């Protein structure tokens, strides 16, 4: 009988120059940001307030983790509009990500970290 080993979670900093993508699940009062490497492995995630100070913290958070080349943002026409402007002003590339079907979200459960992760995956997959 063979046993399967799982890779440990990513705990070491990425090498300098590593490219990353991010996804943001937007809401009226908070935004949840997930950063992935180009293979889709989680690098970091965190929740921020949805205001000017929070936007600045998001930009700093993204820059602190490396070269974030694309950011998938849900709701750039509504709750994500201010954030999309702040990210674009900071020189970051923003891609509109469609919110997932409500019925599908209910089946798997609502999770801001998971929704942010899925937004980043959509950017990686080119489906955003």
Model-based region annotation:
Residues 1-128:
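Phosphate- and other anionic-substrate recognition elements at nucleic-acid/protein interfaces
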């Amino acid at each position: 009988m063979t046993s399967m080993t799982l890779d440990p979670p990513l705990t070491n900093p990425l090498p300098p120059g590593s490219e990353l993508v991010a996804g943001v699940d937007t809401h009226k009062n908070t935004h949840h940001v997930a950063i992935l490497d180009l293979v889709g492995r989680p690098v970091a995630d965190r929740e921020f307030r949805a205001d000017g100070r929070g936007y600045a913290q998001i930009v700093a958070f993204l820059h602190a983790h490396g070269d974030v080349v694309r950011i998938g943002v849900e709701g750039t026409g509504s709750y994500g509009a201010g954030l999309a402007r702040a990210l674009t002003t900071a020189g970051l590339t923003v891609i509109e990500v469609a919110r997932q079907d409500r019925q599908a979200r209910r089946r798997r459960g609502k999770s801001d970290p998971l929704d942010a992760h899925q937004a980043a995956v959509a950017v990686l997959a080119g489906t955003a």
